């Protein structure tokens, strides 16, 4: 009997969490297919505000990367929307005319932002704040415009406003209520929050109702019902969300505010479940992650036939993610005749605490300025703890006063530390004592604590410190390369050298990896470190590379690939152009585009056509997919330009031919400009060369991406040979001392320009670095030609393996 077909509609946090729970209890029961409307793998939507605020990058909020889907034999269709469920024939139909049968179906369509139905809401410059696309829109706007208006002073609106402030914009927050976050805070806490955020630079317009968004093609401002107005170049709508029930309603699945489900997350149609923000349970649709994960656990067990307690609803807690502000609320914090409040207000230090009691039970809490007791109070609310024999005011006094410096020391083992993932203090202690976890990353890998919003990370570290005592290593909390080991990057590298290790599995076995198979974070890193240390003897582990590097092409959101052949220095000829044109016609490649690195990108190549395309092109790989040298961009130079002082094309071609295929911690881009006019943009490259009278200037650590950084002047040299010598030593030193996935810009800021200069100015060290560089380059093979010669591997990779699409 074959596996049952399980289809998940929605690639977000709730739906994929349900899949994770299913895999944990019945890994081989289902053949899983996932449809996601966005072009990305599953990511942590909660942390988009951190991306906007500049605290993290998009890549860092990915929860399950492309490799996770492949490793679990999951067929992922990104950028594809299910538009109909045929409940009679048990199939789903997508906007790409794909028909997918199912035995079990999970609807996790999430929610959609509420856009005010006012004139001008469709103008350019008006956006919601729900996904990566919205975040990119705001990041792009901040580079061109200066005045932002955020409509909505709730949790999401304030996090968006803080991010826009960090991006250098003037931010006004428009809110209909008389104080901020009125659904989570009382008036006192709301006004304290307003005062704090005003100090950070925000402007607030309270009790304002937006009547119109004004402007021609693009937004220019807001007009309010009271006749006043403000200027704005960007408007962010953060006034709420509503469950996305369109698919359910149009498919005959009963809906109300959300898709109606029972206590096991089943809809009224057999074999169809709903989970997350789209689901309505006992009249409530939840929008926070903790209840959605609780739902996912119940759904998974029920679908797999495992006895489980029903889902009976959730008590909610909220924590604002804005730097420098501590805000927490939980439960029912509004006072009434039946509910009385106890409040503590330290006006001098800006600390406000309030609990709401119904009889002898805490039913709600609000904390401002000091949220350290939030988890403890939330646990008491959830458990409906009887406090009849407790001094009421003592509940608001920090337990740390009675139990040393550790808040968590006084907590019971069943108290929840990570509300998002339902991880208790006892579960964390068990992971430390029984599984040997000794860092927050390892705790995250073992238990899931701090995996979502990250707010509980200080408490997790505190439990580690209290449990391990003198064995606790604070430095290890930040330096372990992943949760599979306690070893730092430097320790791993030293162990590989000392023990002569040559394969990723050997490293994990010998160095005592806690997860035998490793993870998608450590395996590519180990593979890189092994090749960097001993390039002539190590065994490349293709399975430890990211999917683009395994396929030697970039996967696109529709499952096709892009192919970029090498064009040294951005220079081509008629023969190569004819080859490219013939390949485009022969394989019906839908898009041909010039890249920013002066190359030609063939986009939309079918997976099975990749080897044939490479063979017909008969050109070297451009490594557009790898952690390696990408391009060397050049201007036309002194041969043709009236201002050029040097032959930039010749040097660019020499650099690219020397260093092509060089594995590096992250991608490396170079450029050579023939004069200080810098037409090749040498000043924002990892290594940039600028021609001057009588020689060259070398710039390093530049970045033209999200975190724009001008390169630093490394030195001046006179000849092309010196450029190649110093470039080789610089790149080798970067290879040997950078963390895997650390760009040269971040590495240079970490180690310091003066330190790098002192290393490269030492002739002996420079010679040694170039010697190791030349050894590495001596084993380089063009991967496309290598695959064409290795028929067996090519067949396995391009014909038999299930990949994400």
From Swiss-Prot:
FAD binds at residues 43-79. The keyword Magnesium does not apply. It comes from the Bacteria. NADP(+) binds at residues 193-223. Its EC number is 1.7.1.4. Pathway: Nitrogen metabolism; nitrate reduction (assimilation). The keyword Iron-sulfur applies. Binds 1 siroheme per subunit. Binds 1 [2Fe-2S] cluster per subunit. It is an enzyme of class 1 (oxidoreductase). Keywords: 2Fe-2S, 4Fe-4S, FAD, Flavoprotein, Heme, Iron, Iron-sulfur, Metal-binding, NADP, Nitrate assimilation, Oxidoreductase. Induction: Positively regulated by TnrA under nitrogen-limited conditions. Induced by ArfM. Coiled coil: none annotated. It catalyses: NH4(+) + 3 NADP(+) + 2 H2O = nitrite + 3 NADPH + 5 H(+); NH4(+) + 3 NAD(+) + 2 H2O = nitrite + 3 NADH + 5 H(+). One of its GO terms (molecular function) is metal ion binding. Siroheme binds at residue 679. Its cofactor is siroheme; [2Fe-2S] cluster; [4Fe-4S] cluster; FAD. [4Fe-4S] cluster binds at residues 635, 641, 675, 679. [2Fe-2S] cluster binds at residues 418, 420, 453, 456. One of its GO terms (biological process) is nitrate assimilation. Required for nitrite assimilation. Belongs to the nitrite and sulfite reductase 4Fe-4S domain family. Homodimer. This is Nitrite reductase [NAD(P)H].
